[in-house]
């Protein structure tokens, strides 16, 4: 018995699998992995000052009742350099910003601040990336909105750009 329609079954299976593959590639995905610390208190830490003339940073510095940003950066990070003017704009808008410098030397942090400005109230040095990992940070730069009680309210992954400034101001103001 001749069954020519059986030849179409493998073709239909291949077409179906190909269609699924194309759909999977065409649908945009959220490829950012957010911290499991969202909605939780900052982990305990006390970091030494990242450079002379700028105070050190601990988790208790961020429990004074004032919401703020916590920026994770590095002097060697190109996107960190690109976001520097927008951090200055946030500071000019009255947003308090603390920072953690990742795997950096004091002289490199000082040179970074001299070239790009210092929007930070305090900068802790996390040379081992221990605090960065406790925060659930996956890279630099990253910025967190911290409530006045030390709760992590929001995480911005990647560099801050002009379009992010109003949103971050709004999130800090909403935390007041």
Which positions does each model-derived feature cover?
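Thiol/disulfide oxidoreductase modules built on the thioredoxin-like
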Residues: 114-119, 126-176
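Aromatic-flanked redox-active Cys/Sec active sites in thiol-based oxidoreductases
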Residues: 71-77
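N-terminal targeting signals for export/organelle localization
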Residues: 1-48, 176
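Conserved Rossmann-like nucleotide-binding pocket used by diverse enzymes
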Residues: 43, 73, 98
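Hydrophobic beta-strand anchors of alpha/beta hydrolase catalytic cores
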Residues: 69-70, 97, 143
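A short beta-strand-turn-helix
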Residues: 45-69
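Structural microenvironment flanking redox-active thiols in thiol-disulfide oxidoreductases
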Residues: 81-117, 127-133
């Amino acid at each position: 018995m001749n069954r020519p329609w059986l030849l179409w079954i493998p073709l239909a299976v291949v077409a179906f699998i190909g269609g699924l593959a194309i759909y999977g590639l065409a649908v945009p995905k959220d490829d950012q992995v957010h911290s499991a610390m969202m909605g939780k208190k900052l982990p305990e830490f006390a970091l030494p000052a990242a450079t002379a003339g700028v105070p050190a940073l601990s988790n208790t510095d961020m429990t004074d009742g004032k919401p703020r940003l916590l920026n994770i950066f590095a002097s060697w990070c190109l996107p960190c350099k690109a976001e520097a003017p927008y951090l200055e704009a946030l500071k000019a808008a009255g947003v308090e910003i603390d920072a953690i410098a990742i795997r950096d030397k004091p002289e490199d942090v000082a040179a970074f601040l001299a070239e790009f400005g210092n929007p930070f109230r305090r900068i802790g040095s996390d040379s081992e990336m221990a605090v960065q990992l406790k925060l659930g940070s996956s890279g630099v730069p990253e910025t967190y909105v911290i409530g006045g009680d030390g709760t992590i309210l929001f995480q911005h992954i990647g560099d801050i750009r002009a379009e992010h400034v109003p949103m971050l101001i709004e999130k800090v103001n909403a935390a007041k």
